Amino acid sequence: MVGRMCVAVLIVLLLVATAGADPNGAETLKENPELPVDFVWALICGFLVMFMQAGFAMLEAGFSRAKNVANVMMKNLMDFAVGSLAFFAVGFALMMGADWQGIAGTTGWFLAGESYDVSTIELWFFMLVFAATAATIVSGSIAERPKFSVYLVYSAVVSAVIYPIYGHWLWGGGWLSSSEFMVKLGGGYGALDFAGSGVVHALGGYIALAAVMLLGPRLGKYDSDGNPRAIPGHNLAFAVIGTFILWFGWFGFNAGSTLSAHELRVSIIASNTNLAAAAGAVTAMAITWLRNGKPDVGMTCNGAVAGLVAITAPCAWVQPWSSVVIGTIAGFIATYGYWWLEKRGLDDVVGAIPVHGFSGTWGLIALGIFADGSYGLYATESPLVTGLLYGNWGFFIVQLISAIVNFAWAFGTGFALFWILKKVIGIRVSPEEEMLGLDIAEHAAVAYPNFVCTETELPLAMKQGGGR
């Protein structure tokens, strides 16, 4: 009965919605004949970002064991599908709708009414693929042990509420970017994040931290004395290919955030993106080579992604040399951050917490340090953005505040969500299911039907009781 009532209400809302501002684009084109070029640019870049889902899927699959690969792929597929519907119905309105008290948007539900407009829906699509990125980050950290149903609920909540509300604070005219206090302290502008080091990556990374804490480590990850054991992924080639896909897609992520093909700064944005990734990869490779005597493939991949994450916020406002410094520090964060977490009993399968969480925070702070005053809030228009190295200590403090708020919101809401799910339905599969593998346990399928399983972990599962 309740379900039928909800459907009826939804139909009524859609039927009574007023016509969009410009659903066929005629008026928009009349006002600005050059706008189609910008539309094509933004959409193509959005397509690149959407394809990053494949990169995340490949990277996570490569770092996971063969018995869990179908589950990994299914999670990455469905967080985009579920997230698309959630962001369509609720998320976009909360993020980009008419501002209410600097907290959230209040218009644009179901892309109906005035939101049924070519310009608005272009923005919806671009923000959607960012929402999908934020959601899928968590998948890798918690791989090989969560219930698939729990992951679906999580994907819907992140795309509908957690990402949109924080996104509104930065990108929708909310309090972090636009309040009088923040703007005055920053010297004419509040908190900034060009393409999402904080809004997307740190958000996903700190939700992952909360989830990993509540899930517990995989069976066999730690010995009886609490020392970590290596659990190798089944295919490093997948991980490297996934890294290449992410690196390529990131040009759409960062350069596409201009939302305009007429913005010539895209050359610097793209170059900064590449340099930071390269510096992160080389740094992580060097650290593992010196530490272990051989360069680690997985850590090198993570170093590249960490560099990409860190440059995402400052990419439009810093010089190329700064991007190398930012990427180098991100390489240190990715490696030492992973080892630091591992020693504390936090089993992050792909290293997403240091790569996206810690490096995302570093990206927000780096913007407050290295912004050089050559680029403004709106292209070359004043005010031009400067950081600590160029005399604007106030903006540096603004970015520190933004980083603290980002952690508090992401970790707090993520912990609350997974804690509630743990109490209500449970968030982890049984020990027997974990040892069998989530491909069979959750989907009655296997990714490699012709492979012979050589793992004999069921006795260990029974002994350790699921690590909970």
UniProtKB/Swiss-Prot annotation:
Keyword Secreted assigned to the entry: answer is no
Q: Does the keyword Transcription regulation apply?
A: no
SUPFAM superfamilies linked to this entry:
Ammonium transporter
Which stretches are annotated as coiled coil?
Answer: none
Please give one Pfam family short name: Ammonium_transp
Q: Name one GO cellular component term.
A: plasma membrane
Query: What GO annotations for molecular function exist for this entry?
Result: ammonium channel activity
Assembly and binders: Homotrimer.
Q: Which NCBIfam families match?
A: amt
- Per the similarity annotation, which family is this? Belongs to the ammonia transporter channel (TC 1.A.11.2) family.
Protein name as annotated: Ammonium transporter Amt2
Q: What organism is this sequence from? A: Archaeoglobus fulgidus (strain ATCC 49558 / DSM 4304 / JCM 9628 / NBRC 100126 / VC-16)
What lineage does the source organism belong to?
Answer: Archaea, Methanobacteriati, Methanobacteriota, Archaeoglobi, Archaeoglobales
